[in-house]
Each structure stands twice: as C-alpha cells, then as structure tokens.
C-alpha cells in the first residue's frame, strides 16, 4: 500500500483518525507501506512545515521522530520506471510511480479524483483512509 503525503500529514495531525489507524495497522505488520526516496522526501518537507507542526502540537524533533517511525515500518521502493505524465497534478506522479514500481494493490489519498482511472490500469485501487481501514477490518 502506498499512502499519499496528505494521509501522512493527517495521521500526524490527528492521532485518532483513519489515517493514523493505517499507520498503526502497518506497525502491527498487517499491511506493508511502500515508500520511495522522492515520496519520503515529500513526507519530510510537508510534515516539517510550520503550519502542520503547529496543528499537530509537535516540536521539530517530535516531527522527525514521527517520520523516522513511518520510514522504519515502510518497505523501500526503487523507482525503475517513470510513467510521466499520467496525472493532472504533476505532484502526484511520484505517488503513482511508487505504487507502480512497488506493485502496490492500493493507493490511499484524500485526493482520489486527482488520480482518476490511471492507477486502475496498473491494478491499483485508489481509496480514502476511512475506506482503506474498512477494508482492512473485513
């Protein structure tokens, strides 16, 4: 499973929400999070923004600890193939490329519409965090 940056930020900002539940499920080993270097860098850059730190009530050090924990439970994905351009938002391309190269079966994002039908061509289902948690519970 690949989680978009918006899901990582939501997990950091709201530890009781569906996004954080996805990370807890990964920590329990029930799902595998896939992450590439470009996606990890985006996680770090976005989570480190003052706006998100303040909303989460975390210090810079605590944000780094959170990100280290996410990376520790993720499986690294090497990007062998670039599939650009595929999506409306060029910023989403690295998320799709991580999912395709990592052979993910799911991509979790709050921006489902931005990915359109492209991930389905690669056998990847796109869903919001709440939907992902619902499927994991089945």
Language model features with spans:
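Acidic, PIN/NYN-like endoribonuclease modules and their adjacent C-terminal/linker elements
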Residues: 86, 93, 100-106, 112-138
